[in-house]
């Protein structure tokens, strides 16, 4: 069994689940998961965990993400992106860049979002997009997210009653960039939607070092496994502690050990190899997930 992290460059037109399905065939490995779902039309970084690394994927998804995309102001859609049907049109003939920049900056910090109807959030055991496809709208719970950066990265192009520009956003997990694009339009007094998006960074992985499915397939055929990052990459956001060989034996048996730390969760290392995720219990630590077996 192979184990590790893959920095996958997801292409447009496939779901995150599709990408995992295809990788299972390429790698001949059933135990594969992804961190951070991307909508079918969204491209870019999709963290993939293989084998034992699936046990640490949850610790990777806590990291922030960076996206680059395009916002179109002038009409809104059912899905808040370019794939939906037009809902409202508000023709625009002029838009000042400074006004847009000021409005974008107002979203930086902690903000509240309501998930879009076309999303995978579950309400009463049913995904929101299932309600939406049935023509139903349900009340959705608000969520707190953090926007570290939200900036315009191109001039504003005015054409056929619309205004388009590209942007970059750095945000916490759970942020809906589609909704952010719509809310920006509301602040400016116009209908809007997100017309393109790609994820350029997630869980410490960046787009410039990501690999497509075809590239990975070619490497596998050539016997090259350099596309696999070590499982240690998946715990880099956790505090790391070094343990002794005696401690390592205790950990392998699932026993408590003493660690000089106050952190609720730590990654226990013996040298450069991660042994386990350890959880603080009173004055000692108990293995939550043993990774060395």
UniProtKB/Swiss-Prot annotation:
Molecular-function annotations in GO: RNA binding; tRNA pseudouridine(55) synthase activity
Name of the top EC class for this enzyme: isomerase
UniProt keyword list: Isomerase, tRNA processing
Annotated Pfam families: TruB_C_2, TruB_N
Protein family per UniProt: Belongs to the pseudouridine synthase TruB family. Type 1 subfamily.
Catalytic residue list: 39
GO biological process: mRNA pseudouridine synthesis; tRNA pseudouridine synthesis
EC number: 5.4.99.25
Alphabetical list of NCBIfam families matching this protein: TruB
Keyword Ligase: no
Protein name: tRNA pseudouridine synthase B
Catalysed reactions, semicolon-separated: uridine(55) in tRNA = pseudouridine(55) in tRNA
Xref: CDD domains: PseudoU_synth_EcTruB
């Amino acid at each position: 069994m192979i184990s590790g992290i893959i920095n996958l460059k997801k292409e447009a037109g496939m779901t995150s689940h599709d990408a995992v399905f295809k990788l299972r065939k390429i790698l001949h490995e059933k135990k594969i998961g992804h961190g951070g779902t991307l909508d079918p039309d969204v491209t870019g970084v999709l963290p993939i965990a293989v084998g034992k690394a699936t046990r640490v994927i949850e610790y990777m998804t806590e990291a922030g993400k960076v996206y680059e995309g395009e916002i179109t102001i002038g009409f809104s859609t059912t899905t808040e992106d370019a794939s939906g049907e037009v809902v409202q049109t508000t023709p625009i003939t002029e838009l000042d860049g400074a006004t847009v920049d000021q409005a974008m900056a107002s979203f930086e910090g902690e903000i509240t979002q309501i998930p879009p109807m076309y999303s995978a959030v579950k309400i009463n055991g049913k995904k929101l997009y299932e309600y939406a496809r049935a023509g139903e709208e349900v009340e959705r719970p608000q969520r707190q997210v953090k926007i570290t950066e939200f900036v315009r990265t191109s001039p504003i192009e005015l054409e056929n009653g619309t205004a388009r520009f590209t942007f970059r956003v750095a945000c916490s997990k759970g942020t809906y960039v589609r909704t952010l694009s719509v809310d920006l339009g509301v602040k400016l007094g116009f209908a809007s939607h997100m017309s393109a998006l790609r994820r350029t960074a997630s869980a410490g992985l960046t787009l410039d070092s990501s690999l497509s499915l075809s590239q990975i397939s070619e490497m596998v055929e050539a016997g090259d496994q350099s596309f696999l990052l070590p499982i240690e990459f998946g715990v880099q956001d956790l505090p790391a502690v070094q343990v002794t060989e005696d401690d390592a034996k205790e950990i392998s048996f699932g026993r408590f050990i003493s660690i000089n730390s106050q952190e609720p969760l730590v990654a226990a290392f013996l040298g450069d190899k991660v042994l386990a995720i350890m959880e603080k219990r009173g004055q000692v630590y108990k293995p939550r997930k043993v990774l060395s077996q």
